[in-house]
Amino acid sequence: ISISSDFVLVRVVNVINLGRMGYLRANDVQMRHARQHLDELAGKPSSKGTNVLFLVEHTPVYTVGLRNQQYSHEDAFRLKSLGAEYYKTNRGGLITFHGPGQLVAYPVLNLQHFKPSMKWYISALENTLIKTCQKFGITARTTADTGVWVEDRKIASIGVHGSRFVTTHGCSLNSNIDLNWYKHIIPCGLHGKEVTSLTKETGQEVPLSDTISPFLSSFQEIFDCDLEYNLLEAHEMEELITNQHVLTQRMQNIQQSVRQMSTSAVHQPQAAEPIIANPMW
């Protein structure tokens, strides 16, 4: 949360583009940022959570969610023999694929700053993806099945986890991904369903880089927040991946000035929420 010059509370989300990265490395980054939120909620003195939207393009990987009983060690070996990694996760949902040409978004948010409801959160992700597709002239929708669909073809997946309304994992949108990877699995456990992409639906090449701006503007509108992003230098990115120092260091002075502003602001009846100010990309 940030405070504008006229003392209006504004939700601010950092956007950090991790580029192309393996699944485990990106997972570690988001989990450590989620821990900052949880430690702050637990009252740990030096912990300050930051609302962050991580964007990443994964190297080939199959991941399974909590309902993974149908996938055996033999299945894992078979999928890894294709040249992909394979991991079990604590997100909701069944098996899916991530790889080059797919935009993956991991919002690490304290939903107390938005709406403390996982149902609302999933709906907000769905609407963000639908609006992104609309920007490419594609009519997408939700169905009784998970994810976002173009008619009966799945173009985006959602699999999230929440702890004390702190979110991890997120969603993925197929841009120009190689759809052959999906032929080796039953995506999200849905038999007889086709997987599609922006490239396939539009009939022209849509590189992943072209999906970032439409996705971010859709996210900003649906989540009713401001986005802050700065390009990190190589050494800053490496430091971000290995520890929390980059965010913590950049936030200290800003948070102090925001708190000083808040003490002189008109009293807010529900001002128990932590104040978070954010610069990052």
Region annotations inferred by a language model:
Residues I1-I155, V206, E238-W281:
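N-terminal lobe of the biotin/lipoate ligase/transferase fold
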Residues T63, T167-H169, K183:
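Short, well-ordered strand-loop elements centered on a beta-strand within folded domains, enriched
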Residues Q70-H73, I158-S175:
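Short, conserved beta-strand/beta-arch hydrophobic-aromatic motifs that form part
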Residues T139-T143, D224-E233:
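Flexible, glycine/charged-enriched surface loops at secondary-structure junctions
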Residues N180-F223:
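A hydrophobic, small-residue-rich beta->alpha segment in the mid-to-C-terminal subdomain
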Residues P107-L109, G162, L173-I177, T199-T202, ...:
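Short, structured patches in soluble enzyme cores that scaffold and shape functional sites
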